[in-house]
């Protein structure tokens, strides 16, 4: 999710992707003085550069320009298969809890995957261009997406339909819910627009100095922003004022993550300069953070996530290995129609053979 994780033990791992097609795993080892970051695995995961990585309490998913999503069981430290459905670059990934993974791609699709059997439950024709970013509401009932068709779209995940479309006149690169889900941030080039959920209108704008590449809500009122100017800035979301600024790297900042440790926040940054750095930050009295530890991966990093183990319930049926999913409908939201037009927006669902219904415009039908 978008807020700081709370660490219940000392098992913290960082997973990073890079232009060189490699996935790196590192264990964070806290100490009284300098923290250390120790390598746990290196895997040549893809045949093209990585664009996205996301974590649940058991799995890591990575997305690449090679059109595949690769899965890893972090508890067993083994590969868990690949998801093959998108036609084009995988641009964004997000787990919701332990049950679902959402993926967005260059093909304009958003796919909803079940993590139990790694089936594609639903395929949504989300944007006319590329899906550049998506974010799931903390409740799991809504999702936001932005794309190269200059629209911001809200999706009803319970009914599997488009709920709202907003023309934003520019292509947005990032969309992100706040931890409380009462607001969300949308990045367009060098600015962040803050929207309220109630009215879906902009309540403030944060102006950055250069192009923005990453965002992280440290808590509902604090937003960390990184981009092409090597610095990280932390903003008060209500006033849109910068409350902290520090130089984090020697090159552009590509990813920001965070987790809580004891009474402070650990900010994790990754850059094209190859470094992953850990910063100690007090969220109650914001001051320049202290560098806890760093590691030079010698790779051009593109994405990063924090992984921590969670409790998993033993079941008689073990999760299946991931394969290409082409013939599954969502058991929670049965789809009777293949082409659904709701409030003027067309949503195309998979039929039972993975094909799409073609033909002329039909009468409006409802998702049951």
From Swiss-Prot:
It is found in: Nucleus, Nucleolus. GO terms for biological process: maturation of LSU-rRNA from tricistronic rRNA transcript (SSU-rRNA, 5.8S rRNA, LSU-rRNA); negative regulation of signal transduction; ribosomal large subunit biogenesis. One of its GO terms (molecular function) is protein kinase inhibitor activity. WD repeats lie at residues 45-82, 85-123, 126-165, 207-245, 248-289. It comes from the Eukaryota. Keywords: Nucleus, Repeat, Ribosome biogenesis, Signal transduction inhibitor, WD repeat. This is p21-activated protein kinase-interacting protein 1-like. It comes from Danio rerio (Zebrafish). The lineage of its organism: Eukaryota, Metazoa, Chordata, Craniata, Vertebrata.
């Amino acid at each position: 999710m978008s807020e700081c994780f709370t660490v219940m033990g000392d098992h913290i791992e960082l997973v990073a992707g890079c232009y060189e097609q490699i996935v790196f795993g590192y264990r964070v080892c806290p100490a009284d003085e300098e923290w250390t970051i120790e390598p746990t695995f290196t895997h040549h995961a893809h045949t093209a550069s990585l664009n996205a990585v996301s974590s649940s309490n058991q799995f890591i998913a990575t997305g690449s320009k090679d059109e595949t999503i690769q899965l890893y069981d972090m508890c067993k430290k083994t590969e868990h298969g690949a998801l093959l459905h998108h036609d084009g670059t995988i641009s964004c990934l997000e787990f919701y809890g332990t049950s679902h993974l959402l993926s967005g791609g260059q093909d304009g699709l958003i796919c909803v995957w079940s993590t139990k059997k790694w089936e594609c439950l639903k395929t949504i024709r989300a944007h006319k261009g590329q899906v550049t970013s998506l974010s799931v509401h903390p409740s799991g009932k809504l999702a936001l997406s932005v794309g190269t068709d200059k629209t911001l779209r809200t999706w009803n995940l319970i009914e599997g339909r488009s709920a709202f479309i907003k023309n934003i006149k520019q292509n947005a690169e990032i969309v992100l819910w706040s931890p409380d889900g009462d607001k969300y941030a949308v990045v367009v080039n060098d600015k962040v627009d803050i929207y309220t959920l109630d009215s879906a209108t902009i309540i403030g704008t944060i102006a950055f100095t250069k192009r923005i590449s990453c965002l992280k809500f440290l808590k509902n009122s604090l937003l960390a922003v990184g981009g092409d100017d090597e610095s990280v800035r932390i903003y008060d979301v209500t006033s849109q004022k910068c409350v902290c600024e520090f130089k984090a790297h020697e090159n552009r900042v590509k990813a920001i993550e965070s987790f809580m440790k004891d009474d402070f926040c650990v900010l994790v940054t990754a850059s094209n300069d190859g470094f992953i750095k850990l910063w100690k930050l007090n969220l109650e009295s914001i001051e320049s953070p202290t560098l806890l530890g760093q590691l030079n991966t010698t790779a051009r990093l593109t994405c990063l996530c924090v992984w921590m183990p969670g409790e998993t319930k033993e079941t008689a049926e073990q999760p299946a290995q991931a394969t290409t999913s082409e013939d599954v409908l969502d058991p929670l939201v049965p789809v009777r129609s293949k082409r659904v037009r709701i409030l003027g927006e067309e949503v195309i669902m998979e039929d039972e053979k993975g094909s799409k219904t073609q033909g002329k415009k039909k009468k409006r039908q409802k998702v049951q």
